């Protein structure tokens, strides 16, 4: 939903929420209205959006009809992918062989936005609304999304439903890789050794010339070239039919993702400062037990991610501008243990369980550069202090216990209880920089600002049942029914993030900043899945 900046319809906009008016009568009224959904306050007022568009004045500059100031857009990521792949395998001895191959890939992804629904309007004027607001309307050039169209017709495009608007560019990726793997086994020992070497080239090709960046938006960007490689080894040993161990190690370097390689790919060709190839080092080891139908596995792992890059775009209340926040040198460290077992109880009934414990933390204080989106000017740079904070949005402790049943007549059923803990909120990097500190902040104020929220532990009960019928040993008819969250617990937080924005608080002598309220994702209530299938 795209709306006029001064007529926001997003219901969780901070000025529509009770927390913005804490301690006032309107705050108390809003709190009650949100709890009871008075006047559908939780929902978008679609009738109002249509009425606003239908009541806009006509403007002959853009033809007949009324200009929409609210509409629904559809963001496209249209891929065109060419792949060439070849491989070979050669038997060296009875128990040894070598495999190898080569892969060539050319990917061109077109990113653009399309006018999907004008909500009662007749056309959409294709200009950068935020640049128009920030720079005023005296000089129309800076807020043109397509300068070639503007120079030809003397005004911005009047986009109709189905037309492209706002941005249109290609993301290009050219990759060549060659790999080889050696496998051998003897006396219960298995060894795999493998390697890969390659090269990746990334570049942006702008299809439109933006008014804000006349010389840096259309055509090819700088081409980013990366050497890529991968080295890995795997070892396994069977003591007996019941006992075995395996271990593996890997080190690799890969090109960054296209969207992380450019500061603002929708508007210009500028490369993210500090961008580099990403590295991964990992080791893991497991012990496996199998005695009859009893199965168990114990595993440990350690993984280090290095030199990752991330770009955020947001409105910065400190600098009063829309910004791109580019971080480089992000390191993460994951390590943990996993235990799983399956024990038969009686005639098709089994007890299953698993325990997973991990510690996933940031292992560096990344460098950041904050760039004003409308000008490309660097507003701030420094360090993000989040070393030893937890990686977000995944439970780092989890347990599962359940019963499963499978009969000889192809009937199967299961029920399981899942427990999750040590799950953390996604952090705002801005809160952990020196840019938001003021002279009158105490150490306690800083700790509170930079504290990372941990979610409450949660339990979820699930169940499923299904059956297959075989017809003439050729066809299969079957069904399955799965019910998730049987206890209908809708208070479980599954993720969320700190907003990057800050509220300014001023007194006679100082200015301080208050974080916006965090946003959360919650688990659905009881959910049912029914699947009927026929295989032939």
Where are these regions (language model features)?
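Outer-membrane beta-barrel transmembrane strands
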Residues: 1-6, 68-113, 160-190, 224-228, ...
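Transmembrane beta-strands of outer-membrane beta-barrel pores
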Residues: 3-5, 104-110, 186-188, 197-203, ...
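Signature of Gram-negative outer-membrane beta-barrel scaffolds
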Residues: 69-71, 97-240, 367
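Gram-negative outer-membrane beta-barrel transporters
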Residues: 302-304, 325-431, 533
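C-terminal beta-signal and adjacent terminal beta-strands/loops
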Residues: 351, 419-438, 467-536
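C-terminal beta-barrel architecture of Gram-negative outer-membrane proteins
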Residues: 392-472, 495-496
């Amino acid at each position: 939903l795209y709306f006029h900046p001064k007529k926001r319809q997003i219901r969780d906009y901070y000025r529509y929420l009770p927390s913005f008016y804490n301690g006032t009568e309107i705050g108390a009224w809003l709190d009650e209205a949100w709890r009871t959904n008075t006047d559908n306050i939780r929902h978008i007022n679609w009738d109002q959006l249509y009425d606003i568009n239908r009541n806009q004045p006509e403007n002959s500059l853009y033809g007949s009809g009324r200009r929409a100031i609210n509409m629904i857009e559809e963001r496209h990521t249209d891929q065109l992918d060419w792949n060439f792949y070849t491989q070979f395998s050669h038997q060296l001895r009875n128990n040894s062989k070598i495999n190898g191959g080569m892969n060539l890939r050319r990917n061109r992804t077109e990113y653009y936005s399309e006018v999907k629904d004008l909500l009662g309007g007749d056309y959409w004027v294709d200009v950068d609304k935020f640049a128009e607001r920030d720079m005023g309307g005296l000089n129309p050039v800076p807020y043109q999304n397509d300068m070639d169209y503007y120079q030809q017709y003397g005004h911005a495009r009047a986009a109709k439903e189905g037309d492209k608007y706002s941005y249109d560019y290609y993301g290009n990726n050219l990759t060549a890789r060659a790999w080889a793997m050696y496998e051998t086994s003897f006396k219960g020992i298995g060894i795999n050794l493998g390697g890969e070497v390659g090269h990746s080239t990334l570049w942006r090709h702008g299809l439109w010339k933006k008014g804000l960046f006349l010389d840096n938006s259309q055509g090819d960007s700088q081409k980013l070239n990366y050497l890529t490689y991968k080295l890995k080894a795997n070892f396994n040993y069977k003591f007996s039919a019941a006992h075995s161990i395996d271990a593996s190690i890997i080190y690799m370097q890969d090109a960054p993702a296209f969207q992380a390689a450019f500061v603002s790919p929708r508007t210009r060709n500028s490369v993210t400062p500090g961008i580099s190839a990403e590295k991964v080092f990992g080791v893991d080891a497991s012990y496996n037990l199998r005695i009859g139908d009893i199965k168990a596995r114990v595993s440990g792992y350690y993984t280090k991610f290095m030199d990752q890059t991330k770009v955020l775009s947001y409105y910065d209340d400190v600098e009063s501008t829309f910004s791109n926040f580019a971080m480089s040198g992000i390191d993460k460290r994951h390590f943990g243990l996993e235990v799983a077992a399956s024990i038969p109880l009686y005639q098709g009934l089994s007890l299953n369980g698993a325990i997973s414990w991990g510690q996933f933390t940031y292992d560096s204080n990344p460098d950041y550069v904050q760039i004003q989106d409308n000008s490309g000017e660097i507003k701030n740079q420094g360090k993000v202090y989040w070393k030893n904070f937890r990686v977000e949005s995944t439970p780092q402790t989890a347990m599962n216990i359940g019963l499963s049943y499978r009969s000889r007549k192809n009937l199967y059923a299961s029920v399981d209880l899942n427990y999750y803990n040590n799950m953390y909120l996604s952090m705002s990097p801005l809160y952990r920089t020196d840019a938001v500190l003021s002279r009158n902040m105490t150490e306690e104020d800083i700790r509170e600002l930079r504290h990372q929220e941990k979610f409450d532990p949660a339990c979820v009960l699930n169940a499923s049942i299904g059956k297959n019928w075989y017809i003439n040993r050729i066809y299969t008819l079957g069904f399955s029914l799965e019910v998730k969250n049987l206890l209908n617990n809708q208070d479980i937080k599954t993720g969320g993030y700190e907003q990057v924005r800050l509220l300014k608080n001023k007194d006679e002598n100082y200015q301080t900043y208050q974080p916006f309220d965090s946003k959360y994702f919650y688990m659905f209530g009881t959910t049912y899945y029914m699947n009927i299938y026929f295989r032939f």
